[in-house]
Regions:
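Sec-dependent bacterial lipoprotein signal peptides
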Residues: 1-18
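Residues within mature, well-folded domains
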Residues: 20-166
Length: 166
């Protein structure tokens, strides 16, 4: 019974967060919405990335509990030029061995967790995501030097309620 209660609570929290984000997104329009409107809907960004030429990208991270991260680009004129959910299989395919971990962070946002493994000398950077239609997965970037990608992998999110996690 306790597991069902935790599963129901986790599902309700996830649906509420997704619903809120969808409502916020529907209220914004590329080319028209201002940075003030974006911040009014989404709040203070987790990080602001300089794009050069006066443009910048606002990171709205939904990790560790959620499965989405949003990058919202504000052009030099102060209007929203792009709103992207970046935790997708297409974006993961662009993460390649040798890539700088800073670039990975820039593309995907802050990971859900970072776990060092002393015996193997590896560090795993994990992002939760939904693989269509609604399968909870984990994208992992593995580094052996702390600076670059050694390899990547996709697997089930073992922390998800359906796998006995929280």
């Amino acid at each position: 019974m306790r597991i069902l209660t935790h599963l129901a609570a986790a599902l309700a929290a996830t649906l509420a967060l997704v619903g809120c984000d969808q409502q916020r997104i529907s209220e914004l329009e590329e080319g028209l919405s201002t940075e003030a409107e974006v911040r009014d809907r989404f709040g203070v960004p987790d990080h602001v990335w300089d794009e050069g030429g006066g443009a910048r990208t606002l990171e709205y991270n939904r990790q560790p509990a959620g499965q989405r991260n949003y990058m919202i680009t504000i052009g030099p004129d102060g209007t929203m030029s792009a709103l992207r959910q970046v935790l997708t299989p297409q974006n993961f395919a662009r993460i390649t061995p040798g890539m700088d971990l800073g670039e990975v962070r820039r593309r995907l946002g802050r990971p859900a967790k970072v776990t060092p493994y002393a015996l193997s000398g590896e560090t795993h950077h994990d992002w939760r995501f939904l693989e269509p239609p609604q399968e909870r997965k984990m994208f992992t970037v593995i580094s052996t030097d702390g600076r670059t990608v050694a390899r990547t992998q996709v697997g089930p999110d073992m922390d998800a309620p359906e796998h006995g996690g929280r």
